Amino acid sequence: MQEVQRLWDIRQEVRIKKPLVCNITNTVVTNFTANVLLAVGASPLMSEGWQEADDLAKIVDVLVLNMGTLHPRQVEYFIKAGKSANQEQKPVVFDPVGIGATSYRNAVAAEILDKIKLDLIRGNHGEINFLAGITGQTKGVDSLSNQISVKHLAEFANTTRTLVVSTGEVDYLSDGAKTFTNKTGHAYLQLVTGTGCALSSLAGAFMSVTEDKCLGVLSALAFYGAAAQKAALISQGPGTFAGNFLDALYGLEFDEFKKILEAPKI
C-alpha cells in the first residue's frame, strides 16, 4: 500500500508542477505525444530548430530525444540540445527508435551515447537488446523480440550510468544495481502508433518532478499501463482505445490505480 501511494504521489506532483517537456521527436507521433502529456497535466513543447537549444535548456524541465524519423538536421539538433541540457543540469531521455534496423540509426545512437549524458534510455525489448549488445530482432521500428536478458539490461545500465527501461508484455527498469518490473499494460498499446514514444516523454515528465528519478520512471510505467487497462475495458479495438486511453490518463483515480497494481497477474 505504501509503495503504491509513493508511485501515485509522483503522478500527483506532475499535476501540481506541470513540468515543461521539450520533445525533439518524430513527425509520426508529435500530436499523440503532446496529447498524452497534456492529459497527465504536463506541458509539452515540440521543437525542431537547433538555434533555440540554448534558450530552451534554461526553461524546460526535461529534454526528450526520439530518433523515429531521422534526418541530418535533426541529428545536429539532438547533439546541440543534449549538450545544452547537460550544461543546465536538466535530465535527458533518449528513445532509440528502430535501432538495429539500419546502420544510419546505429551510428546516430552511438553518437548520442558518446556525446550526451543521458538520464534515461527507453526502448522496446528488441531495441534494448541491440543496445546492450545482444542479438535482438527489429522490423522497421517494431520489436520482434518478446524477451530481455535482465542480466544484460543491468550491465548496460551500469556501463552507461543511466536508467534503462525495456518495455514489452512485462516492462523492466534497471539502474545498474537493481532491476524492477512493471506488469501493467494492455496489448492495444502495440496497435496504436506512438504509444511507446509517448511513454518515453511521459517518463521524462514523471522523473523531472522527483529527486528519486528511478521511482519517477517506475511510477510512469505503472500509471501508463494502468490507464491502458482502464481504457481497454470500454474499447472495441485500437481506434476507440486511442481516445479512451487519453481520457484514462486524464481521469484515472487512486482507487483504480491501486486496484490494478494489486490485482494478481496471470
From Swiss-Prot:
ATP binds at residues 122, 167. GO terms for biological process: thiamine biosynthetic process; thiamine diphosphate biosynthetic process. Its EC number is 2.7.1.50. It catalyses: 5-(2-hydroxyethyl)-4-methylthiazole + ATP = 4-methyl-5-(2-phosphooxyethyl)-thiazole + ADP + H(+). Its cofactor is Mg(2+). Substrate binds at residues 46, 194. Pathway: Cofactor biosynthesis; thiamine diphosphate biosynthesis; 4-methyl-5-(2-phosphoethyl)-thiazole from 5-(2-hydroxyethyl)-4-methylthiazole: step 1/1. Keywords: ATP-binding, Kinase, Magnesium, Metal-binding, Nucleotide-binding, Thiamine biosynthesis, Transferase. Signal peptide: none annotated. It is an enzyme of class 2 (transferase). Catalyzes the phosphorylation of the hydroxyl group of 4-methyl-5-beta-hydroxyethylthiazole (THZ). This is Hydroxyethylthiazole kinase. The gene is thiM.
